[in-house]
Amino acid sequence: MSRRRHSDDSDDSDGQPHKRRRTSEPSEIEERLESLICRVGEKSNSSLESNLEGLAGVLEADLPNYKSKILRILCTVARLLPEKLTVYTTLVGLLNARNYNFGGEFVEAMIRQLKECLKVNMYNEAVHLVRFLSDLVNCHVIAAPSMVAMFENFVSVTQEEDVPQVRCDWYIFAFLSSLPWVGKELYEKKDAEMDRLLSQTESYLKRRQKIHVPMLQVWTADKPHPQEEYLDCLWSQIQKLKKDRWQERHILRPYLAFDSILCEALQHNLPPFTPPPHTEDSVYPMPRVIFRMFDYTDDPEGPVMPGSHSVERFVIEENLHCIIKSHWKERKTCAAQLLSYPGNNKIPLNYHIVEVIFAELFQLPSPPHIEVMYTTLLIELCKLQPGSLPQVLAQATEMLYMRLDTMNTTCVDRFINWFSHHLSNFQFRWSWEDWSDCLTQDLEKPKPKFVREVLEKCMRLSYHQRIIDIVPASFSVLSPANPVCIYKYGDESNRSLPGYTVALCLTIAIKNKASNDEIFSILKDVPNPNQDDDDDEGFTFNPLKIEVFVQTLLHLAAKSFSHSFSALAKFHEVFKTLAESDEGKLHVLRVVYEVWKNHPQMIAVLVDKMIRTQIVDCAAVANWIFSSELAHDFTRFYIWEILHSTIRKMNKHVLKIHKELEDTKARLARQHKRRDSDDDDRSSDREDGPLEEQIERLQEKVESAQSEQKNLFLVIFQRFIMLLTEHLVRCETGGIDVFTPWYKSCIERLQQIFLQHHQIIQQYMVTFENLLFTAELDHHILAVFQQFCALQA
C-alpha cells in the first residue's frame, strides 16, 4: 500500500512529492517495524539469536519516535502469537536491558491489556498474556516475588463464595499452565510460597464437582486411553514436572543465549493485580476433557511420544493448538506452520498433529473452528507429507472405527462428515474389506451404522452408481438406496386408491401450467376421510387432499432441487391453505417423507425450504421427527441434521428480530441526543412517535418469537422424555438390558441438543427445570440435565 502511494506521489506535478513522501514516511516505518516483529522467529539464514539481537537494536533506535507503536505491536503479538511466546519474551528482555523505562512501560501495558481481556470475557487470550508475563521472569524483566504474588491472588479466587466453579477453574488453569515455563525459576526463588500455592490448588481440585465430565467425553470407555478432565490432567502433568525438579525439555528458550546480558538488567515489580469480581455478564470458558488417541506404542520406529502426564505433551499440544488458531483461515500456511514445528525431529510430529486436529474436531460442545476447516487442513497436510502423513491418518481412522462402540454420537456425526468428505478428495479409495466385520453385526450397532451413513454422505458428494461401484458387493446391505421418487399414483395397479383420478387431473393441470385457483378447483371434490360432511368449502385439514397434491407435485418436480423449489414457490398459496392447521403441516411432512424416503438429502432440503417459506413451522418439524412414522429412521443421521437445522433457523429468527429492536432503540437514542442540541422540541416529539410505536411492535414480536423458541425446546425435550421413559419402563418390566444401541443413540441425541444450543437453552433453564426435568424423572434422563447444568456452574 505504501509503495503505491510513493509511486503516485512521484507523478504529481505540483512540486510537492518530496514533502508528501516525508509525511508518509512514519507510516512506512511503522509497517516495517510491524513486519520485522511479526516475522522474527521464522525460518531464516541467520540464527534466531542474531535476528533477535539485530531486531532489539533496530527497535531501540526507533523507541524515541515510535515507542507507543512498538508497545502496541509487542502487546498484540503476546496475545495473538503464543506459539512464539519465548521469542518475544527474549526480545522484550533485550529491550529492557537496553532501556529500563521501556521495560516498565511494557509491563504496565500488558497488565492493562490483561485487565481489559478479563473485562470483555477474552479468557483464552488472557491465558496467553499471563504465560507471557510469567516467562518475563526468566528474561529478568519481572521480579519472581511479584509474579508469585500475582499467582497468590489467582489461587485466592477459589476461596470466593457464591461464584461459578468455572471462574475458579480459569484462574487455577492460568496459574498451572504457566508453570512449565516459569516453575523452575519461581521454585528457586520462592519455594515455600510455591508449595503453599500448590497445596491450595490441590485442595481446590479435590473438592470441585465433575458432574459435567461424561457429557464432554469423546468415548465412554477409558481404555486404551483415559479421557481425563482438563484440570485433572494438567495437575498430574505439573506434579510429574515438580517430581522431575522442574526440568522441561521441549520449550524453546532463546533467552538462555543472552543470560550474561539479561542477568545484568534491572527487574520490575508487577503492579498489584486483583482479579476482577464476578458479574452477571461474566462468561467463562467451559471445562474440557483431554482427547487422547495415540501413545508411544503407535509409532515404535520413530521418536518416542511423550507420556500423557508428561508436561512436554501439554506444551506440544498447546503450541499446535495455538498454530491452528493463528492460521486456521489459511489452510496452506497452517499446514506448513504445523509441519515446521520446532524440534520436530525429537517427537513423532505427524502423530501429534493428527491427534490435535481430531481433538479439536471432536471437542464438545463444539469445535473451535468450522468442521470443514479440519478436512481441508488434513488434505493439505497429506499433500505436503505424502510419504508419511496419509499413513498416520489411515491408522487414526482405523482406531476411530475400532472404538465406535463407545464413541459419543455427536463425535460419530463429525467423524462421518470428515471421513466422507476426505474420501471424496481421494477418489473414494478405501480398503473396505478391512471393515467387513460390520457386516455380521446387527445393523443398528455403531459400526454398520457408521459405514452406512458414510456411504450415504459419499453419495451426496458423488452419485449413486459411483458408490455402488466403489464398495464390494458384500456391502450391498449397507449401500444407499437408489434415490428415486416413490409416487404411489404412478402405477396403474393402484387405480383403486382414493384420489387416483384426482392425481391424474392434477398431473395434466400442472403440466399445462395451471394457476393456484385451478388447483384449488380440482382439489375441491376430494372427499375428506376425517368427516362425513365437508361443509366448510373443503379447505380444513384433509389428509387425502394433501396426499394427492403433495405426492403429484413432488413427483413432477423430482428432476432436481431447483425444480422442487420452483414447484414450492409456484404453488405456495395451495400449500399454505392445505397446511393451515397443525395437523395439516404434520401431514405435509409425512407425505414428503413417503415420496422421498430413499433420498434423505432431498427430504432435508425440502423441509428446510418449507420452513423458510413458512409452509410448515419449527414445532411441526419437531413433532414429525418424533412421530411413529419416522420411528424406523429415528437413529439416522439426516433426521438429526434436519432437527438441528430447524432449531438454528428458529434461533436466527429470534436474533434477527432482537437486532431490529436494538437498532430501533439506538435510533431513538440518537434522536434524543440531537433533541438536546435542537430548539424545536415539537418537531422532535413528532419524530419520536413513529419510532416509539415501532419499538413497541418489535418488543411484542421479540416476546412472541422467544415464546415460540421456548415452546420448540419444550416440545423436543418432552418428546425425548416420553420416548426414553417408555423404553426404560419396557426394559424394566421385561427384564431387558436398558443400554441398547437405540438407547445410547437417543440419550446422546438429547445431550447433543443441550450442547449444540447451550447458549439459548440457558435462557429458559428455570422453565425446563420446573416443567420437565423434575426430581420425579428417571435418573438416567435427569442425569443429562444435571450434567448440562454443571457445565457453567
Swiss-Prot record:
One of its GO terms (molecular function) is RNA cap binding. InterPro entries: ARM-type_fold (IPR016024), CBP80 (IPR027159), MIF4G-like_typ-1 (IPR015172), MIF4G-like_typ-2 (IPR015174), MIF4G-like_typ-3 (IPR003890). GO terms for biological process: 7-methylguanosine mRNA capping; mRNA export from nucleus; nuclear-transcribed mRNA catabolic process, nonsense-mediated decay; regulation of mRNA processing; regulation of translational initiation; regulatory ncRNA-mediated gene silencing; RNA splicing. Its main location: nucleus. Keywords: Coiled coil, Cytoplasm, mRNA capping, mRNA processing, mRNA splicing, mRNA transport, Nonsense-mediated mRNA decay, Nucleus, RNA-mediated gene silencing, Translation regulation, Transport. It comes from the Eukaryota. Signal peptide: none annotated. Residues 30-242 form the MIF4G domain. The keyword Amino-acid biosynthesis does not apply. PANTHER family: CAP BINDING PROTEIN, NUCLEAR CAP-BINDING PROTEIN SUBUNIT 1. This is Nuclear cap-binding protein subunit 1. It comes from Gallus gallus (Chicken). The lineage of its organism: Eukaryota, Metazoa, Chordata, Craniata, Vertebrata.
